[in-house]
């Protein structure tokens, strides 16, 4: 039986369909999860996709964090379930306390939409084992509030524990502290990143297929769990 990976849809989510397709391309069963669901339908992992959940009112991810399904995601993550937050999903995971820090308005206050080179800094997470350390991958970036910020002590802790998972290569597109594009939880099971790997799973339709590695990695994690 193939792994079951849930993909959450909030009001305002845009990239759930692409995440579902990425899951299927990797060879897993995609399970649609609605924001009001009170259970996770026996999934093995969860993806919180990008978009503008609840219109980004208050601040990005602030309302989605209180959706019924997120209560279940937090409980499951605390028990070791792999969770991936992409763009708005990363913001939601930070708001939910599963990842430290916050995502704020881009430096320069412009929405950014471009293909972005990333450096894979950690391959020790549930979502990055298929990559080589230091690999350069090309992934679309599209966000207005993608500037990662945290207290200096938190940044030092992330660096010291190897929890910076992705870093922007070359110029820093949004002013994120230390060029951070993605981080993980202490156990490596929860990962959040601003760029969109689900838009880079097929060379025909994306800038590359470099993003597929995240979805393949979690399948490896689930098989060996």
UniProtKB/Swiss-Prot annotation:
GO cellular component terms, A-Z: cytoplasm
CDD domains: GATase1_FGAR_AT
Listed pathway(s): Purine metabolism; IMP biosynthesis via de novo pathway; 5-amino-1-(5-phospho-D-ribosyl)imidazole from N(2)-formyl-N(1)-(5-phospho-D-ribosyl)glycinamide: step 1/2
Family matches, as Pfam families: GATase_5 (PF13507)
EC number from the UniProt entry: 6.3.5.3, 3.5.1.2
Signal peptide bounds: none
Domain Glutamine amidotransferase type-1: 4-225
Source organism, top-level taxon: Bacteria
Principal subcellular localization: cytoplasm
Localization per Swiss-Prot or TrEMBL: Cytoplasm
GO biological process: 'de novo' IMP biosynthetic process
Catalytic activity as recorded in UniProt: N(2)-formyl-N(1)-(5-phospho-beta-D-ribosyl)glycinamide + L-glutamine + ATP + H2O = 2-formamido-N(1)-(5-O-phospho-beta-D-ribosyl)acetamidine + L-glutamate + ADP + phosphate + H(+); L-glutamine + H2O = L-glutamate + NH4(+)
Active site annotation, chain numbering: 87 (nucleophile), 196, 198
GO function term, MF aspect, one: glutaminase activity
Keywords per UniProt: ATP-binding, Cytoplasm, Glutamine amidotransferase, Hydrolase, Ligase, Nucleotide-binding, Purine biosynthesis
PANTHER family attached to this UniProt entry: PHOSPHORIBOSYLFORMYLGLYCINAMIDINE SYNTHASE SUBUNIT PURQ
Role: Part of the phosphoribosylformylglycinamidine synthase complex involved in the purines biosynthetic pathway. Catalyzes the ATP-dependent conversion of formylglycinamide ribonucleotide (FGAR) and glutamine to yield formylglycinamidine ribonucleotide (FGAM) and glutamate. The FGAM synthase complex is composed of three subunits. PurQ produces an ammonia molecule by converting glutamine to glutamate. PurL transfers the ammonia molecule to FGAR to form FGAM in an ATP-dependent manner.
HAMAP family (alphabetical): PurQ
Subunit organization: Part of the FGAM synthase complex composed of 1 PurL, 1 PurQ and 2 PurS subunits.
Name of the protein this chain belongs to: Phosphoribosylformylglycinamidine synthase subunit PurQ
High-level lineage: Bacteria, Bacillati, Actinomycetota, Actinomycetes, Mycobacteriales
């Amino acid at each position: 039986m193939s792994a079951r990976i849930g993909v959450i849809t909030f009001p305002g989510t845009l990239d759930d369909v692409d995440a579902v397709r990425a899951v299927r391309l990797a060879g897993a069963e995609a399970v649609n999860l609605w924001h009001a669901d009170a259970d996770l339908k026996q999934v093995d992992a969860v993806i919180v996709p990008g978009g503008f959940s609840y219109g980004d009112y208050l601040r990005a991810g602030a309302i989605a964090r209180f959706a019924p399904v997120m209560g279940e995601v937090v409980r499951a993550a605390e028990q070791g379930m792999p969770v991936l937050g992409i763009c708005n999903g990363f913001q939601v995971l930070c708001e939910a306390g599963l990842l430290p820090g916050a995502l704020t308005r881009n430096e320069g206050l412009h929405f950014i939409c471009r293909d972005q080179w990333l450096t894979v800094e950690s391959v020790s997470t549930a979502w990055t084992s298929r990559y080589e350390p230091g690999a350069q991958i090309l992934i679309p970036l599209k966000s207005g509030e993608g500037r990662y910020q945290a207290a200096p002590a938190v940044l030092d802790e992330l660096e010291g524990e190897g929890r910076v998972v992705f870093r922007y290569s070359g110029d820093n597109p949004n002013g994120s502290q230390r060029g951070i594009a993605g981080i993980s939880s202490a156990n490596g099971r929860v990962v959040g990143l601003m760029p969109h790997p689900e838009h880079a799973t097929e060379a025909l339709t994306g800038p590359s297929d470099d993003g597929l590695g995240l979805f393949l990695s979690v399948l490896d994690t689930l098989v060996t769990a």
